[in-house]
Every structure is written in structure tokens, then in C-alpha cells.
Amino acid sequence: MLMMVIRIYIHKRLNAKDYNNFYTSIGDFGYTIPGSDAPQYNIESDSEHYLNFGIAHINFNNGTNNQITNPNPEVYTRFYIQMKTPDGQDRIVYEAENANAISFLIRSTYHKPMSGLVGGFRFDPLLGIRVYKDSFVLADELARIQSEFTTVYGNSGINVTENTTNYSVRMYWESAVVVEPGEPSPENPIPWLSNLPNITDGNPENIDGQWGNVTGFNYNPTTKLFNADVIYDGNSYPIRDAVVASNDDSFLTRTEKAYYFTQGGQKFLYLNFSKDIDSFMFKNHYSELKNWVGHALWNLSTGEVNVMEQLKVFQYLKFTEDNELMAYFYIVDTPVDDLISVTSNVAYRYWKPTWFGLGPKEPGPIQNKIITAAQGEFNSIRPTWVKPVYLGSYFAGASGLVIAGSALIKGGSPWFGLGLAGVGILAGGILQYADDNEWLNYDIAQVQKLEPNVNIRSEISEAYFNAYGQMFPSTLGQSLYRISYGQFDQSDLQVISDKSDVITVVFETDGITHTYQKDQIDDTWDGPATEIPLGVDGILPEWALWLITIVIGLFALSNLQKIFDTIKKKPIISIIVVIAILYALTYFNLL
């Protein structure tokens, strides 16, 4: 049985001529269904019944209450408000079922650089730029379905509007439409499933498109049978006695609002655990998403159910020998087919050596670095052995020059010293040039899938157990990833776990891309990189170093004359000592 869809559109009514669109008397203030005695809406100028709020604007600064009455509740069972998006798509911003009336409060604010009102209307008789903002608060007569949305738009000059599609809306009541699925047969054992429409526009990849609206939501926890209607493009498609295969059916009892979509040839129900309009992760732009509390995706084609609440992310971090911060990255209790990207705020500090590396290391200030690791991208890692080697070569070269100079002063041969200097300076120069041009660097994938072998499992199992009170899963497939957060300039680093955050996670499961933001992520940072580095206590305690310093100082004071005589008689040795001190300061990052 197929019934034709019937819609009744609600038109905007003003008490002054609205630039030849439509008008009525002041007694018809607000919104109402046009009657036979009222001027008809100009269908030819806007066949889609969208109402342009910016052409004539009424002063509603203090708000005005309006009510739209259902002309026939037995026929018109759904009420919709749609708004044009910037790309011209139709987007539902409010909907209600089985309502006799819809009440809403509208507040309008108006800003312009010039003053003056004309007849109580926000018309600017002079050319100027103005900005309008309309806020709608809507509810049905029982306050069962409440929502709020805002339109913002600009105007320049008389009767010249900008970005019309950003604030044009339409409102309508819609009648029920039924497309019967037929009876089961050997060729079509689940007729309601094959009867469901293939939607090409509204889905998680195109959130502003038209989704299927799920109404008549009915689940029996005893029989585990689910019934509902999918409303799409003026038709109603029944879901009849769908069997819930999951042992945990709480996702259905928690569902507040549902939508239908198709993707990759499969049919899905998107079951949201809140009915607030800004709580739908897949139907909101992320700048609009505020109150997400969780949802479930029910693949009607396969029966698989994927429940997603606050995303739990476990990271086991450590620094490699080349100061690369890497993490074993695992999303807990959530299937992941493909990790696309991770963006994190890494808080860290550097433990600075003292007393030429002999004393205890001191913690530096906490610094922050925003890092994104993306699939298909690589980090270039500079081997840390290169810098000490070319600094050592330069030291050897400088020492060779000192030896050659000393030999010349004494009348000996300088060739050994010159040879040592040449080799040292040449080797150091070549290594430094290669290092500066990253010739010795190697690439590490920023996101890399891992098979969790015994070594990895034994390494992270204790930290995982401490975080979640359970053993690390034995069958992870490709859900475990190695994340490279890049190379840091210094060693002896510590990641400050309680000040670090995973900001964004993007992954794909069953062909659907999921994006989680900071407030939706419960992240755990663990591993050796989050601990105080080894050896921070130093080789000697601080009191011993002070004692040694005092002894050396007293010895130097008592032998100042001998020291000055040595510098005069043997300047070469003094130069070597100075070079050694400078090298040590550089090596320990004290210069």
C-alpha cells in the first residue's frame, strides 16, 4: 500500500508589505497557516517554500511567543523545520512527532552602524551594513521535544541581502506515508530489510544531506524484537520484528533519537543517547557539537552493533635512543579498522644536568607541544650519536693544533699534531654537514599498525592492568598502533601525563569515519616516558660535590702563584684544559 505524502507549509506573516513576497494584517501576527482570505505565497518565486528572514525584520528584542497549530493531528503526524546550509543543502534543525501544536519563542537582535527605526521595523533607510541574529526556542505542547537554533546573517543597503541560504528556513506539517514491504518469501526472507531505501545524500560523510528519520520506536526486551518506521523523501518504510542479535540490548533502551542511512551498500540505524540537537556526532558539524553522550551504530545488513560512548584511549609511551617519542596506541573496547590521525598536546619537561653530569639533575619548566600523527606521513629522525662524534672530532682537531704549536715552540716536528688536526676537523666538518642536511636521518611512519607480539604484550600489560583492572586483550588484530610523536632536541625528557591530552582521534570502522574531540576522549598516558628519567640523582650526592668544590677552591687559592706560573710556562696545556671544559659544557647542554 502506497499513500501520497501531504505537506502543509507555514509561511511567515508580516504586518507590512514584504517586498512583494506576501503580506497580511497585523491581527495575523507571528506564524500561521495561510487561509483562503490571506494573500497566497508566491510559489513561482520560491517553489521550495523557504522563508527569507532578512528581507523584512521585525523588532523582537524582548522575545515573542508564537504557536503553530496542527490542522489535523490524525493526518499530520510530524512537524519539521529545515534550514538552508551554506552549500545549499536542506538541513532539519527541529522535528517533532504526534504533536497538536508547536510553541516557540523567537528573539531577534539587530546591529547596525547607524541609528533609527522606521515604523517599528528594523529597516535602515540609509545604506549601511547590519547584522541580524534570530534565536528560536521550540517545544511541542507537552514540552517533550525541545530544541534551540540560531540564524545569523548580514544585510547591506536597502533590500539587498547577503548569504540568503544561511538563514532561509521552512516549516511544515507532514502526513504519514507507508510503503509496505510485502510478505516473506524464499527469495526475500526479510522483506522489510530489502524494502528500506538506499539513501545517497544523508550519511556520516555528508551530514547536511537528507537522512532517514526513525519514528515509532518500539523495542520489546522480552522478545528482543524491534519495530520502527523510517521516514525518507515523503515515504514511510516499516521495520518489522527486527531481531537484536547483541547480548547487550541496553543501547536500545538508552536511545533517545534515531536516524537511518546507507553506506557501502549496507543499511544502518544511528541511535543517539540524547535527543538534544547539538548532541549528534554524525549530524552536527564539530563546531556545533556540544553535548555528545554516546551513540550506537546498528548495521541492519549484518546485525552487528557498535556502541560508542566516551572514547577510551590507552597510550604506552617511551623515548627511543634517538629521543623519538613513540607510543603504543590502543583504543579500548572499540573496534578500529584504520587509524587515520591522532592529535595530542604533549606536556613535557627536560631534566638538566648539573656539576658536569656528576650531580643530580634538575627539572626544567613544563613545556607543551601540539603534535599530529597522520597515516601516510613520516617523521625524519636524526641519529643522536652524530653530534657527540663531530664535536669530539672538532675537539681532537683543536687538540692537534695545540700539539703542533707546542712542537714548533720546542723546535720539534709539528706533523703529528697537524695530521691529527686535519683528520679531526675534516671528519667533524663532514659529519656536521651531513647532519645539517639530514643525510643520516631515517624515516619513521607516524601511524603504523602492529601485530601485538609477546614482547609488546609483556611490556605494556602491567600498565594496562593498572589503568583498567583487566589484562591486555589477547586478540587485537590491527587495533594496536605505533604512534611517532617525533623527535625531541634533548635527552632526559619526561612526559607529564596529567597535563597531556589527546585532542582529536580520527579512525574508520566498517567504512564509517569517526572523529572524537578532547571532551569525548578519556585518555591514559603511561610508560617509561612518563616517569622521571633514570640517573637523575647523579653519580655523587650534592653534599659530596660541594665538599669537593670547596677543597678544590681552597687548593687553588693556596696555589694561585703556581697556577699563574704554569699558565705562563705551559700555555698549550692551559689551552687544552679550556677546550676540554668548553667541550664538556657543550656535551652536557650547559652552553
Swiss-Prot record:
Keyword Transmembrane applies: yes
Subcellular location: Membrane
Species annotation: Acholeplasma phage L2
Transmembrane segments: 389-409, 411-431, 538-558, 571-591
Organism placement in taxonomy: Viruses, Viruses incertae sedis, Plasmaviridae, Plasmavirus
Protein name per its UniProtKB record: Uncharacterized 66.6 kDa protein
Topological relation to the membrane, as annotated: Multi-pass membrane protein
Keywords: Membrane, Transmembrane, Transmembrane helix
Chief location category: membrane
GO cellular component, one term: membrane
